[in-house]
Amino acid sequence: MSDIAERVKKIVIDHLGVDAEKVSEGASFIDDLGADSLDTVELVMAFEEEFGVEIPDDAADSILTVGDAVKFIEKAQA
């Protein structure tokens, strides 16, 4: 797992209070990890702060899984 993926995973664990083994790249924030819409907004804000990237609302709406977040952040930092 890349450094970005590890940091995303830590943020998800901290914000959602889920077990580390549940957090995989294919895990859906809502369907698999029990997040609600407010949780997803807070996760996006945490990703922006941690990685120094801006995630526009339309992009945030397409970040549905841990892997989606990692891919967006990797692309934004490239």
Swiss-Prot record:
Q: Which Gene3D superfamilies match?
A: ACP-like
Q: What are the residue boundaries of the Carrier domain, all occurrences included? A: 2-77
What's an example GO BP annotation here? lipid A biosynthetic process
- Which key words tag this protein in UniProt? Cytoplasm, Fatty acid biosynthesis, Fatty acid metabolism, Lipid biosynthesis, Lipid metabolism, Phosphopantetheine, Phosphoprotein
Q: Which InterPro entries match?
A: ACP, ACP-like_sf, PP-bd_ACP, Ppantetheine_attach_site
Its GO CC terms are: cytosol; membrane
Pathway(s) per entry: Lipid metabolism; fatty acid biosynthesis
Disulfide-bonded cysteine pairs: these are none
Q: Which of the residues bear the PTM O-(pantetheine 4'-phosphoryl)serine?
A: 37
Q: Which GO terms describe its molecular function?
A: acyl binding; acyl carrier activity
Q: What does this protein do?
A: Carrier of the growing fatty acid chain in fatty acid biosynthesis.
Q: What is this protein called?
A: Acyl carrier protein AcpP
Q: Which gene encodes it?
A: acpP
